Amino acid sequence: MDMSSANFESVVRGHHIYKSIWNPAVGERLDVSIERDNAHDRYAVSVQRDSVIVGHVPREVAKVFKAFITHGGEVACEVTGRRKRGNGLEVPCVYHFKGKDKIIVGIMQLLKLTTANKMYS
């Protein structure tokens, strides 16, 4: 099966919690993985630097990210801007998805629907 890639502009959430251990730099690449032991959110997906959590994927799209990773996809995060106020302190980024063609298409459609629904609710 062919592999594809896609990008999704978003943010790393929770920087206000991790600012003492992480100073984001534009262009920095971070790992993204399911956070299996998060007692507050069973769909939590963490953003990590050197295996240390420095933030999270926004809750609105975390379920979609988790499904993608569970089905063999890979996600990386690239910092694109300086931190800003949003839902706490957020760091602008692009999430890079890599996986099977069919799954990439489905995930991008889900992300588009999820973020469109958020804008109108």
Predicted feature locations:
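Conserved active-site motif detector
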Residues: M1-S121
